[in-house]
């Protein structure tokens, strides 16, 4: 017999029903979120590891294909530091924030709005996601003012205003805006803006259904367990009792400021978990912590 063009299933292997269960579990979420806006802050290891970068692009593309409007705001601090080093520029941080002079802001623009942004766009487009790379300077998207400690940090800004019409124009056209967090003021001074802060401001301005932070943190930890859901009252109590400490405090405070601004839910997930984005959005258990204003009970996973 000539070589067969048919193909057998592997001996002893039967289709795994768990895959079907996962797909069915996702269906009500797909219906619920169709036409809604998700703002995703993309950072951490998920931006550095090649496998995780491709998985993120696939996940984002799938969200868009099922009718969710996706807006991405990305970081890129490591890339900025590497470029600065190559150019012989000194990198200085004060309380974890980059001191940004005129030379450094040029590096920020070149790196964030250049290679970092375009690499993300390319990966998403290779999966058919129709991404477009922009910065806060495009179409007057992000108006900024100097940060409170600008005398020390230099050209580090905070968001004053978001041009939602431009973002809506892109998402309504089926595109995925990938935004470099740079803004400028009325005197055309350009500012480096913290990506977390920019994502939160954009989510509030768009009245997004979700703001999702992708980082290297599993979620909000209480003892040796991760909170699946945390409500505002419990968060305040955990901070007061010293259960939530350190760098998690500003994350929690920012999350509830965002919810107070009209965003539906805020999520904190670990981008090192394979398909963390889809698991958080489309499964009952999720993988990280979701912040809500009120919940019937505290759920620990």
From Swiss-Prot:
GO CC terms: cytoplasm
UniProt keyword list: Amino-acid biosynthesis, Arginine biosynthesis, ATP-binding, Cytoplasm, Kinase, Nucleotide-binding, Transferase
CDD domains: AAK_NAGK-C
Enzyme type, top EC level: transferase
Enzyme Commission designation: 2.7.2.8
Catalytic activity: N-acetyl-L-glutamate + ATP = N-acetyl-L-glutamyl 5-phosphate + ADP
An individual GO BP term: L-arginine biosynthetic process
Location relative to the cell: Cytoplasm
Pathway terms, separated by semicolons: Amino-acid biosynthesis; L-arginine biosynthesis; N(2)-acetyl-L-ornithine from L-glutamate: step 2/4
Site keyed Transition state stabilizer: positions: 41, 251
Residues reported in the UniProt entry to bind substrate: 76-77, 98, 192
GO molecular function: acetylglutamate kinase activity; ATP binding
Main function: Catalyzes the ATP-dependent phosphorylation of N-acetyl-L-glutamate.
Similarity section: Belongs to the acetylglutamate kinase family. ArgB subfamily.
Name by which UniProt lists this protein: Acetylglutamate kinase
Organism: Chlorobaculum parvum (strain DSM 263 / NCIMB 8327) (Chlorobium vibrioforme subsp. thiosulfatophilum)
Gene responsible for this protein: argB
């Amino acid at each position: 017999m000539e070589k067969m063009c048919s193909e057998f299933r592997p001996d002893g292997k039967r289709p795994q029903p768990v895959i079907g269960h996962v797909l069915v579990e996702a269906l009500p979420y797909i219906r619920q979120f169709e036409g809604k806006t998700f703002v995703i802050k993309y950072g951490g290891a998920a931006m550095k590891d090649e496998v995780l970068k491709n998985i993120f692009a696939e996940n984002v593309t799938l969200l868009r294909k099922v009718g969710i409007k996706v807006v991405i705001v990305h970081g890129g601090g490591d890339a900025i530091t590497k470029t600065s080093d190559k150019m012989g520029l000194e990198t200085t941080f004060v309380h974890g924030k980059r001191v940004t002079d005129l030379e450094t802001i040029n590096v920020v623009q070149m790196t964030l709005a250049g290679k970092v942004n375009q690499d993300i766009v390319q990966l998403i487009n290779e999966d058919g996601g129709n991404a477009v790379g922009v910065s806060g300077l495009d179409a007057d998207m992000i108006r900024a003012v100097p940060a409170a400690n600008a005398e020390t940090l230099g050209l580090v800004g905070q968001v004053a205003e978001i041009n939602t019409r431009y973002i809506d124009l892109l998402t309504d056209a089926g595109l995925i805006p990938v935004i470099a967090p740079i803004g400028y003021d009325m005197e055309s001074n350009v500012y480096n803006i913290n990506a977390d802060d920019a994502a939160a401001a954009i989510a509030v301005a768009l009245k997004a259904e979700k703001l999702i932070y992708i980082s290297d943190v599993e979620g909000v930890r209480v003892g040796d367990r991760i909170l699946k859901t945390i409500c505002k009252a419990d968060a305040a109590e955990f901070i007061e009792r010293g259960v939530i400490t350190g760098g998690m405090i500003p994350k929690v405070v920012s999350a509830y400021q965002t919810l107070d601004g009209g965003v539906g839910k805020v999520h904190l997930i670990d981008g090192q978990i394979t398909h963390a984005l889809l698991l958080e959005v489309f499964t009952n258990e999720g993988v990280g912590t979701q912040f809500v204003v009120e919940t019937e009970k505290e759920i620990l996973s």
